[in-house]
């Protein structure tokens, strides 16, 4: 998602984390991300040959008023429904929000930081893989939520390290 455009566009293929991951690995990567997507109530339909599900949601839930604990509870509910083995699931907590057009309060920033700890504990509880994108120096756009093009590249580079 490119927040610079009026209706929200997309960065070029060379700048999107999903496309960078596919290019660098040769893997078939299915991007199920949607602008504004919140944690679903039920597990997504996955292809039968899914090797790895990388799950990174929660920011929009926090923006819509969920507490970090409520968002983590929603994650637990959906992740518990998956028919994948624990080592086939990688939960990535989004980087913390920053002051910006979509982030009018310090409380949202604090909640996004608290959410990271909730997700870490959830991953341990479920025995699934975990990564904290807050540790990856991801640059965020003026809205305080979405990645810049450089942020996408940094995310992809760090994710590749986690997956190696």
Show the residue positions of the predicted features:
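A short helix->loop->beta-strand "cap" motif at the edges of active sites that frequently abuts
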Residues: 84-89, 128
